[in-house]
């Protein structure tokens, strides 16, 4: 199962990166139920939860009403109204920071926010992630491509989980700016594995887990292929729910 990770006074800030149908949204949706309080900022209208709201202030009021609350803010209708979107995000962030227990805010489709001019919203989420150690708030960000993740948001993340890449430009970005050829090879293997097993009806796929700190926390187990773990130990291939035979489970 997914680990419940702690860093100081919050869970880790995570990025989930992968093309459509790669298991990225599935991983984010499943992992949130291992946290007591989560808010999913959803512009697609496809994410479900026990509590779904259309206004940011209603989501903010729901935080902490019960010991375990998972809410979704369906805000796709606000993509053409950056000011109202920002106001909703601020209300949610403030409520999460005031709550006495840990809260995770899931900020999906970051590339769409970036492309449609929601710079202030992205900047505010960066601030929430940066001060999360003191306030007990963590942020998970999701994007389809690695180059879509804004530098200021990427700087406050603890880990990135790659569920695959969509094209050569994505791989070239990883090669040039992130993890060189070894990481590219691992993500390619994950992508190939997904394509092969998806035809067989699989719904869960492996991913590459990379630590931003560069700490050497991973090592290959006997019999593991070389591409399942980096030489310096700062990334490895893991199963999405800690099962199966590819790579090794985590937690």
State the predicted function of each range.
Residues 186-197:
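Accessory, usually C-terminal, subdomains that scaffold auxiliary metal cofactors
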Residues 7-10, 32-35, 63-69, 96-101, ...:
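Flexible, charged surface loops at secondary-structure boundaries
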């Amino acid at each position: 199962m997914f680990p419940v990770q702690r860093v100081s006074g919050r869970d880790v800030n995570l990025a989930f990166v992968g093309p459509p149908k790669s298991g990225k949204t599935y991983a984010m949706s499943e992992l949130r139920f291992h946290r007591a309080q989560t808010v999913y900022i959803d512009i697609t209208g496809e994410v479900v939860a026990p509590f779904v709201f259309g206004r940011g202030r209603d989501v903010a009021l729901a935080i902490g009403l019960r010991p375990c609350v998972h809410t979704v803010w369906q805000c796709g209708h606000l993509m053409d109204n950056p000011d109202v979107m920002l106001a909703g995000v601020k209300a949610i962030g403030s409520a999460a920071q005031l709550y006495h227990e840990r809260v995770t805010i899931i900020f999906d489709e970051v590339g769409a926010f970036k492309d449609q001019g929601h710079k202030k919203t992205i900047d505010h989420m960066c601030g929430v992630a940066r001060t999360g150690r003191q306030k007990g708030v963590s942020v998970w960000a999701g994007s389809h491509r690695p180059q879509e993740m804004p530098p200021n948001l990427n700087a406050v993340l603890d880990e990135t989980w790659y569920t695959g890449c969509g094209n050569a430009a994505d791989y070239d970005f990883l090669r040039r700016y992130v993890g060189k050829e070894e990481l590219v090879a691992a993500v390619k293997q994950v992508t190939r594995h997904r394509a092969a097993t998806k035809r067989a009806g699989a719904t869960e796929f492996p991913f590459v887990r990379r630590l931003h700190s560069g700490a050497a926390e991973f090592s290959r187990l006997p019999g593991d292929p070389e591409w399942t773990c980096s030489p310096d130990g700062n990334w490895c291939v893991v199963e999405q729910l800690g099962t199966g035979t590819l790579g090794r489970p985590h937690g």
